[in-house]
Amino acid sequence: MNYRILFFLFIIPFFGLSQKTKLDLKNIEKNISAPNSIYNYDRLIFKYKGLPKSIDSIEAQHLYYGRNFRKDLVSQSEDDFKVLAEAFKKNNFTECIRLGKVLYAKDPTNLDVILILLRAYDQTKDIGNFSHHIAQLRLLTDAIKNSGDGKSEKTAYKVNSVGDEYIFLNMMNVGPDYTRTSKILKDGVIDVWEKGENKIYIKVLYLDFNF
């Protein structure tokens, strides 16, 4: 969606320095569903909503990639999201906040919803909510950044969806002058974004894991 390009012009300098963490999707699935796990999804969401800056890199990894094993997510194809996107296109930021809060309550780690809320809070000069959601966006996108180095197919960055891929590309300052080639795998698609000698490998994960 076009709002990504417009919005990321002022939030590109996001990524901090942090250690790469091995991505183990089966372990994440197990941890987030275990009631007594420190990485139980509901427990992490509670912490993420209240004090996002207290979330460490492993917790952020469970929050972002744990989305693949949830059934209660907001989709861009849903009518409620389409209404939110339409309000955004019309620059009706008060309505964006009203609608966005509802979808955020349902799916608080949805990058699309967070982006729209951020833009709306920026336009309405709501510094408190803006800062809160910036911290959330930072930790989720850092989880993507820490999933690899993007220099090869084996060490590709991993994203949950094509939409998240484009959000991440904007944050990496990858523009329309890059070309893309794709390779289908059993558990996802590898996209190679190329400009001259520069290549960035991103793996879009399938939601249904059979491995």
List each model region and its residues.
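TPR repeat positional signature
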Residues: 80, 114-117, 121
